[in-house]
Amino acid sequence: MNAIQESFTDKLFANYEANVKYQAIENAASHNGIFAALERRQSHVDNTPVFSLDLTKDKVTNQKASGRCWMFAALNTFRHKLISQYKLENFELSQAHTFFWDKYEKSNWFLEQVIATADQELTSRKVKFLLQTPQQDGGQWDMVVSLFEKYGVVPKSVYPESVSSSSSRELNAILNKLLRQDAQILRDLLASGADHATVQDKKEDLLQEIFNFLAMSLGLPPRKFDFAYRDKDDNYQSEKGITPQEFYKKYVNLPLEDYVSVINAPTADKPYGKSYTVEMLGNVVGSRAVRYINVPMERLKELAIAQMQAGETVWFGSDVGQLSNRKAGILATDVYDFESSMDIQLTQDKAGRLDYSESLMTHAMVLTGVDLDENGKAKKVKVTLGNADAENQEILSGLKK
């Protein structure tokens, strides 16, 4: 290994001080911040909030201090349909309801994984992975569909937010503490030679404790409820004693079994046209597996545009923290000028960014509009970002590589 020599550092000083541009950027960046100093004026011109296809102007929902973006995005795709079809105003589906059942199901998923790996040492890679984070807020499209199909959905007015659904840190800390303790109980029971029935009986006792904790923290979910509303024409509508599953089938009524997650992962280990999954990722035991179909980016764009042209908003995920100006509402790879300002060359392609851990999907959102050119190609898309950090605004996404 070669250490940095003082003579080399002297050379770097000399090169920097000889460049007047660097000193100007130093003044701007040190006083205003790096991104503010490098922001491209043209990015605002290229991303004006006008779209040739704009599906919704509904008020944006806010996930607050929780990791429920995937739930919010999925429920917002239904919400647009319901508001349009039933002439509703300021209507939301309950994100807290889906959150409750996700925590319940993830707890069972974790305990079943603990049972399945009980013959492995605590130091094994899989067991360490399980115990590191027994459960957390995040999820995928297939996971939220599994929850909808099993537990249905309810209006937010029926099961509103709680402190622990809007800010989930305390709940997650306590639930993970319980689950790690439960993992030890089940592993010790299996190590003592207990049979399958005894282990499952104990697991059910542990799930009762977890259910009680969730109900006391979030509120007990409704088994049946009354649904009453006034539409935009001020007509009164009501329905008595409907279950969450009945509400889902009657009012949402989408063939979600026909929807799949399509991704663009141009890495050598993931050929296009094939289906992929992630081991030990899920929530509802026995439900649909998390699955992705890998396609070229142009095909992904075509599918998203076609779905919006058919009148449906699109659930999607991206690396939302990369190269964005949230205050301006712009998410685009050319929003900041690193090259001509700082002489920094950001040339790593998407495959390289994925392979070298520079990028991954971090946030789920909804595509709600698109601006097409004369050839039907997307110039920019409209994105609904249900996130408190972005001041609950809609952002724009430039469709560049």
Q: Residues of each region from the PLM?
A:
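Short aromatic-glycine-enriched beta-strand elements
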Residues: 377-382
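Structured alpha-helical subdomains that flank or immediately precede key functional sites
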Residues: 1-63, 71-359, 371-373, 385-401
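Catalytic cores of glycan-processing enzymes that make or break glycosidic bonds
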Residues: 67
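Short beta-strand or tight-loop elements
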Residues: 363-365
